[in-house]
C-alpha cells in the first residue's frame, strides 16, 4: 500500500482514493489493517470490501513468532537477519510458510480484541419474526457432486461479451466516507453460504464419534459441548451419510459466517450505525452448482468459462415435446430407460447456472463494487443485499438472516463459548481428524 501511495499516480491512479478488497485470508488481512495502530494515525486506504474472511483463532505473540522465525531461518541456513533479508524470494515462497500479523503490542491498536468479543445486542428476536425457521445454507446437501467436477482452465468464454455494466437503480449518491472518521473506513462485508466446502476433503474423514470426542476436548465443558451438538444435530449415532453435511454446516458457521456477522456488527457500532454494507452471496457457482468459497470471485472477475449447459436455447427445450405419446403396453420398459436422463442422479441435487442468471449476478456484483470504489453508497446500509440463489439480486430486510443464515443457532451454541473457542472449533474440525485418531 505504501508503494501505491508513492507510485500509483504515474499509472493514472489516485493515491487519495484507494479501495481494498480481499477474500479468505486476504479478507482477514484487511481486517487486521483496519484494526492496526498505523491505520489510526495514517490510513493507507479509504474503503474496503471483505469477502468471506478466514481467520486463525489466535494470533502469535512475540515469543511464538520468534520460534517460528528461528525454524524458517534454520531451514534456509542463515544465522542473521541481514542474511535473511538477502534470501531470494523464490526460496521463501518455496518454504510454503505464511506468517501474518503478530500481537506484539505495536501493530494493533489498543483494545482491538473487543472486535472479537461479540458484545453487541443481537436483533434476531424482533417482534413478528419468531415463527421463521432456520434453514440450511444453499447447497451443502450436494457435496457429493462437488467432488466430481473440476474447474476448467482460466480464461474468458468467447461466447460472452465483456461485462458491460447494466444501468441498475443506483443508491443515493452520498459519498460513502464523507461523514466518517478517516480511520473508520466504509466497509462492504459478507460471505458465501457454503464457504466450508473449501475444507470438504479433510472434513469428509470425520466419523460421528470422532467429532463428538473432539468437541468435548475443545470445549472442556459438557454443557457448552451439548449446546453445539444439539444445535447442529450431531451425536455419536449420527449416520455416516449425514455427518459430513452437519460438520460442514458447523465449520461454515464457526470459521466464516458467524465471524463475518460479528465483524459487521462491531464495525457498524463503531461507525455509529453507518458506513457498513452487509451482503450474502447464495448464488451457485457456474461450474459446481453450489455457492462455494470464492464463487463470488468467479462472478466478479468474470474469467472462468461457463459450461455448455449454461447456453441451453429455447429450441433445445422445445425438443422435449415430440407430439403425443404412442408407446405400446407390450414394449419393454428398458428400451426407454436409456433416454430418460442425460445426467447423473447427483446432478438433480445442484442448480445449473444459465447464461441469464450468471450475467445478472455478474453485472450487479461488478456494478455495486465499482460504485463503492467511486465513493457512492452501494445500497442502503440498513438493508442486506442478496446475490442469489438462481440469479436473485436486490436489497432485502435484515430479517432475511433468519432464513439464510443460522443466526439463532449461533446465539444458542456460539455466544456462550466465545469467539476464540468457536474459531478453534472451526479450525480443528476443518483440518480433519489426526492420522489414526478420531476416525472410529
Spans of model-derived segments:
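Short beta-strand immediately N-terminal to the catalytic nucleophile in serine-hydrolase-like folds
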Residues: 20-23, 51
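Gly/Ser-rich "nucleophile elbow"/oxyanion-hole loop immediately N-terminal to the catalytic nucleophile
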Residues: 5-21
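Short glycine-enriched nucleophile-adjacent loop
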Residues: 27-40
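Mobile gating loops/cap/lid regions near enzyme active sites that modulate substrate access
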Residues: 258-261, 265-440
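Alpha/beta-hydrolase fold catalytic core
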Residues: 222-271, 277-278, 282
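Loop/turn elements at helix/coil->beta-strand transitions in domains of secreted/extracellular proteins
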Residues: 14-18, 42-47, 183-186, 270-276
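C-terminal, loop-rich substrate-recognition/catalytic regions characterized by aromatic stacking residues
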Residues: 182-226, 366, 429-440
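Substrate-access "cap/lid" subdomains that shape
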Residues: 6, 42, 47, 51-211, ...
Amino acid at each position: 500500500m505504501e508503494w501505491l501511495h508513492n507510485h500509483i499516480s504515474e499509472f493514472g491512479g489516485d493515491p487519495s482514493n484507494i479501495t481494498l478488497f480481499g477474500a479468505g485470508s486476504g479478507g482477514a488481512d484487511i481486517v487486521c489493517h483496519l484494526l492496526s495502530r498505523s491505520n489510526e494515525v495514517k490510513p493507507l486506504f479509504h474503503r474496503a470490501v471483505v469477502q468471506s474472511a478466514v481467520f486463525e483463532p489466535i494470533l502469535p505473540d512475540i515469543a511464538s513468532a520468534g520460534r517460528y522465525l528461528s525454524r524458517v531461518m534454520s531451514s534456509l541456513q542463515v544465522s542473521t537477519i541481514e542474511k535473511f533479508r538477502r534470501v531470494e524470494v523464490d526460496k521463501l515462497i518455496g518454504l510454503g510458510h505464511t506468517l501474518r500479523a503478530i500481537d506484539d503490542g505495536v501493530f494493533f491498536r489498543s483494545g482491538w480484541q473487543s472486535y472479537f468479543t461479540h458484545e453487541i445486542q443481537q436483533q434476531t428476536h424482533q417482534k413478528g419474526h419468531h415463527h421463521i425457521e432456520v434453514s440450511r445454507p444453499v447447497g451443502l446437501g450436494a457435496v457429493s457432486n462437488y467432488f466430481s467436477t473440476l474447474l476448467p482452465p482460466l480464461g474468458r468464454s468467447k461466447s460472452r461479451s465483456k461485462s458491460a455494466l447494466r444501468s441498475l437503480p443506483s443508491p443515493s449518491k452520498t459519498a460513502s466516507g464523507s461523514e466518517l472518521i478517516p480511520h473508520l473506513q466504509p466497509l462492504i462485508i459478507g460471505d458465501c453460504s457454503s464457504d466450508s466446502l473449501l475444507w470438504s476433503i479433510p472434513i469428509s474423514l470425520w466419523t460421528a464419534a470422532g467429532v463428538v470426542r473432539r468437541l468435548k476436548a475443545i470445549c472442556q465443558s459438557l454443557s457448552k459441548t451439548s449446546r453445539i451438538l444439539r444445535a447442529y444435530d450431531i451425536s455419536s449415532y449420527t449416520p455416516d451419510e449425514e455427518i459430513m453435511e452437519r460438520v460442514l454446516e458447523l465449520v461454515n458457521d464457526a470459521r466464516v459466517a458467524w465471524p463475518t456477522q460479528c465483524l459487521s456488527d462491531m464495525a457498524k457500532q463503531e461507525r455509529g450505525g453507518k458506513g457498513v454494507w452487509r451482503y450474502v452471496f447464495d448464488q451457485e457457482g457456474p461450474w459446481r452448482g453450489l455457492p462455494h468459497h470464492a464463487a463470488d470471485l468467479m462472478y466478479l472477475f468474470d474469467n472462468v468459462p461457463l459450461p455448455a449447459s449454461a447456453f441451453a436455447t429455447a429450441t433445445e427445450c422445445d425438443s422435449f415435446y415430440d407430439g403425443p405419446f404412442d408407446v405400446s403396453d407390450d414394449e419393454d420398459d428398458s428400451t426407454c430407460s436409456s433416454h430418460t436422463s442425460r445426467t447423473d442422479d447427483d446432478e438433480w441435487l445442484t442448480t445449473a447456472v444459465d447464461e441469464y442468471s450468471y450475467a445478472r449476478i455478474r453485472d450487479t456484483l461488478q456494478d455495486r463494487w465499482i460504485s463503492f470504489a467511486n465513493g457512492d453508497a452501494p445500497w442502503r446500509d440498513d438493508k442486506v443485499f442478496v446475490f442469489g440463489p438462481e440469479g436473485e439480486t436486490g436489497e432485502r430486510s435484515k430479517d432475511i438472516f433468519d432464513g439464510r443464515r443460522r443466526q439463532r443457532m449461533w446465539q444458542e451454541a456460539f455466544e456462550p463459548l466465545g469467539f476464540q473457542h468457536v474459531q478453534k472449533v472451526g479450525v480443528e474440525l476443518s483440518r480433519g481428524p489426526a492420522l489414526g485418531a478420531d476416525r472410529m
